[in-house]
Regions:
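Membrane-inserting effector segments that mediate pore formation, membrane fusion
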Residues: 162-255, 259
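Structural motif
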Residues: 30-35, 78-83, 103-107
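Acidic, carboxylate-rich catalytic segments that either coordinate divalent cations
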Residues: 261, 265-309
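C-terminal-of-GTPase-core extension/linker across diverse P-loop GTPases
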Residues: 6, 125-133, 137-177
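A short, well-structured beta->alpha microelement
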Residues: 45-74, 81-90
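Low-complexity, polar/amphipathic intrinsically disordered segments that mediate membrane, lipid-surface
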Residues: 2-3, 46, 50-51, 66-70, ...
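Extended, compositionally biased accessory segments flanking or bridging domains
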Residues: 1-61
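Canonical P-loop GTPase G-domain recognition
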Residues: 40, 56-62, 97-149
Length: 309
């Protein structure tokens, strides 16, 4: 099954769009209360180091004066273990318009926040991993800059990747269940999987580079394998073929996404592969040049024979 050129073009346009999304400006304001523990301060300091020039983290002390964060702020973090100033400060920040999350070691230290809302929440923990994983999900739930946030802050990448993979798997599950024309689902699924690849590459800071071509080829080949397996299973269970197609499409896409995450976490070096491809291309070019040069005299000789005749 061939992928139409227009769909490949759309896939690479999608890559350019993802690159633009990853470069979207991200602004985080951090307010440090005098009661904040060293654990909270060090955890946030280490986690919020922008990995691109589009990310900015502003840090201020939480004083008695009225707080007025800048209007371009995407999310506000308040680090506190409880104080008399905390509640009024949080109210001022919420009114300013950006989502506010209070980071504490215990929810008891923030009694005025009874439950999370789209504009206000609490993440309380003494375990660094749990704190950051929960905070990552909290931020991703409240921003439309998921790719940019994950590209800038490494602790958010797994949470963002899980969302991308799950979304693509569910999309392809629906495609597998609803597309009944044989072979018609492959281009649609392949396009979604290539889009997933570009998004994952962007959030792990790999960028849209020529090396992605190897991965795109792997995704397309993997899609063909999934398609072959699906056909074999459908023949065995024709009465529930639509369900089999949906499940294998979802499982295959999910597995493909997990494999890509593993690949990007390791940062594979493609220099050797590039050397092989370059050398092969050079040999093919030389061979074509040699063959073309050898056929020119023969063509001239044939033309002369025709004239003599």
């Amino acid at each position: 099954m061939k992928i139409p050129v227009d769909k490949l073009t759309r896939a690479f346009k999608m890559g350019a769009s993802v690159k633009k999304d990853s470069d979207t400006p991200v602004r985080v304001s951090v307010y440090l209360d005098s009661s904040a523990s060293r654990f909270l301060a060090e955890t946030v300091r280490d986690a919020f180091v922008p990995q691109t020039t589009s990310g900015i983290v502003r840090v201020e002390r939480l004083g008695e004066e009225r707080i007025a964060p800048k209007t371009d702020t995407d999310v506000v973090l308040v680090l506190s273990c409880g104080s008399d100033r905390l509640e009024s400060a949080v109210q001022e920040l919420v009114i300013a318009g950006a989502p506010v999350c209070v980071l504490a070691e215990s929810a008891v230290e923030v009694p005025f926040v009874e439950e999370s809302t789209p504009m206000l929440g609490v993440v309380a923990a003494t375990d660094k991993t749990y704190l950051l994983e929960t905070l990552a999900r909290w931020i991703l739930d409240r921003t439309d800059k998921e790719t940019a946030f994950a590209a800038n802050f490494a602790f958010m990448r797994i949470a963002a990747a899980n969302r991308i993979i799950t979304s693509c798997a569910l999309t392809n599950m629906a495609t597998g269940a609803l597309v009944f024309l044989p072979g018609a689902d492959y281009p649609v699924m392949a396009l979604a999987q290539v889009g997933m690849l570009f998004e994952l590459a962007a959030i792990f800071g790999r960028g849209i580079k020529p090396e992605r071509g190897y991965e795109v080829a792997g995704v397309l080949a993997g899609g063909l394998v999934i398609r072959a397996v699906t056909r074999a299973l459908v023949k065995q269970t024709p009465h529930i073929g639509f369900a089999v197609k949906a499940l294998t499409a979802a499982a295959g896409t999910y597995g493909m996404g997990r494999a890509l995450v593993s690949l990007y976490e390791r940062d594979v070096d493609y220099s050797r592969a590039n050397e092989v491809v370059t050398a092969t291309f050079s040999r093919v070019r030389d061979l074509v040049t040699t063959v073309a040069g050898a056929t020119r005299p023969m063509a001239s000789y044939q033309d002369a024979s025709d004239l003599a005749a």
